[in-house]
Regions:
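Active-site alpha/beta core segments
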Residues: 41-145
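Short Gly/Thr/Asp-enriched flexible loops that form oxyanion-binding sites at enzyme active sites
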Residues: 161-171
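A short glycine-rich beta-strand->turn/loop micro-motif centered on a GG-aromatic cluster
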Residues: 150-158, 172-187
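A charged, well-structured terminal subsegment
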Residues: 199-218
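Active-site-proximal loop->helix
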Residues: 184-199
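Short glycine-enriched, charge-decorated loop/helix-capping segments at active-site entrances
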Residues: 29-36, 82
């Protein structure tokens, strides 16, 4: 589907959403998602580009605590499986993505629905379900910053990135999916979201667009 004046991304008013790129979902983690570790260098490149440009970054994470988790996860957690447990090493964001590797997640604040500031224009946000927009302050945060374009990358496309893309579309955001910085993408899955007006781009194209975009949001 060709992009037009309504769907073409505005990189000068964009935010990077990094979805669920946490230690437990990497190759040596408690619940590895195939391909996520392999995508990590590209995700890191995106984060460093947005950070250097002073543009907004939202690290979106899961924390499985108690019963407030997806139904499909509840049996495993009830039976003692520990995945992205609050306060655990596995719940931490992949170290290469953080501005300071000594920063630890404030699980209590995040589970209460608050954003955790980890850098200039850079926050961490917990989401209780697949979509980064469901029961979160994400939409308000982006609107307050003047963002109209979301750039999506991270872990396990068929679940959380895809749900986030659908909800972003319903809220009239322009959307970029960074296809080589998102795990578990297949040609069919990519075709499905492109039909929604999503712009699929490789990392280096996004990097170039950010480098040539007008001044960052203040």
């Amino acid at each position: 589907m060709a992009l037009d004046e309504f769907t073409a991304p505005h990189f000068n008013s964009s935010a990077l959403l990094v979805i669920d790129t946490q230690v437990d979902f990497l190759d040596d983690g408690a619940s590895p998602i195939v391909g996520t570790s392999g995508r990590l260098p590209k995700i890191t490149r995106l984060v460093e580009t947005y950070r250097s440009a002073g543009r907004p970054i939202v690290h979106v994470i899961r924390l499985y605590d108690g019963d407030d988790v997806d139904l499909v996860r509840r049996a495993a957690l009830r039976d003692g499986v520990s995945i992205v447990r609050p306060g655990s090493a596995g719940a931490q964001i992949a170290p290469s993505l953080m501005p300071d590797r000594d920063v630890e997640l404030d699980s209590e604040a995040l589970l209460a629905g608050r954003l955790q500031q980890v850098g200039r224009n850079e926050v961490v946000m917990w989401k209780p379900r697949w979509s980064a927009f469901h029961r979160t302050p994400l939409d308000d945060h982006l609107r307050d910053l003047g963002v109209d374009t979301v750039v999506v990358a991270g872990c396990n496309f068929p679940n959380c990135p895809r749900a986030t893309i659908f909800d972003a579309s319903e809220r009239d955001y322009r959307i970029v999916l960074v296809q080589d910085a998102t795990s578990e993408i297949t040609p069919d899955r990519l075709t499905d979201v492109v039909k929604l007006g999503v712009c699929a781009m490789p990392t280096e194209v996004v990097v170039r667009e950010i480098a040539t975009a007008p001044a960052a949001l203040q």
